[in-house]
């Protein structure tokens, strides 16, 4: 009886499909930053005051505070968030989400995380990264990242007021915002030469951006 066999070309095609499927899985990292040098001591006790950002496709997104009812989500250079001290990067898992889908997801999620709703205990940067991590990998972030917030929920006076008002609101010196906020560009001192599709907010030369500064928005860029 004649039994059909797969040709070498079809086999190689299947192998390419499998390899492309594997290549489509992108690592997801949690980039952890210190808010204070005290973390060098607290870290060994399983606690600390940490800021975190989520990284995939060489894009890192974070969540910070400001006083406006607009998104507090912003994009930074991976592992280099201004105003914070990078500590370590944690591999959380992988995602099959494409770069364009990842960016679209972050833009949609940014509407939920307004700068004026940031709360150090109930809705901070680590809550944001955990929601993203659950969506992308199905796993939560490590418990030690946000442990102090859980402890602080039982003791609101746990953290100094100075840390609450400054450290959690550090934002990058150049922040991007979306097309839909083009009407706000004049208020944020954006030059007309930068075009209508992408705008950058120039922040004063200092590491910490306080709550009275301009609102932050994501940018909608063309994906190659």
Curated annotation (Swiss-Prot):
Residues 26-163 form the PPPDE domain. The keyword Protease applies. Pfam families: Peptidase_C97. GO terms for molecular function: peptidase activity. InterPro entries: PPPDE_dom, PPPDE_sf. It is an enzyme of class 3 (hydrolase). This is DeSI-like protein At4g17486. It comes from Arabidopsis thaliana (Mouse-ear cress).
């Amino acid at each position: 009886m004649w039994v059909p066999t797969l040709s070498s070309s079809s086999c190689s095609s299947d192998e390419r499909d499998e390899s492309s499927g594997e290549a489509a899985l992108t690592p997801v990292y949690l980039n952890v930053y210190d808010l204070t040098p005290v973390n060098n001591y607290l870290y060994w006790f399983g606690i600390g005051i940490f800021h975190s950002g989520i990284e995939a496709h060489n894009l890192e997104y974070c969540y910070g505070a400001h006083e406006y009812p607009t998104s507090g989500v912003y994009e930074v250079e991976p592992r280099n968030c201004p105003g914070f001290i990078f500590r370590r990067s944690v591999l959380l898992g992988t995602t099959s989400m494409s770069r364009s889908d990842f960016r679209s997801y972050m833009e949609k999620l940014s509407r939920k995380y307004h700068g004026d709703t940031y709360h150090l205990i109930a809705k901070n940067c680590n809550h944001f990264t955990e929601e993203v991590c659950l969506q992308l990998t199905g796993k939560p972030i490590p418990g030690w990242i946000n442990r102090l917030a859980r402890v602080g929920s039982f003791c609101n006076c746990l953290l100094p007021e100075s840390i609450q008002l400054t450290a959690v609101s550090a934002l990058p010196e150049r922040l991007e915002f979306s097309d839909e906020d083009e009407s706000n560009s004049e208020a944020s001192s954006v030059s007309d030469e930068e075009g209508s599709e992408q705008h950058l907010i120039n922040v004063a030369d200092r590491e910490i951006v306080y709550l009275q500064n301009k609102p932050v928005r994501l940018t909608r860029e063309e994906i190659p």
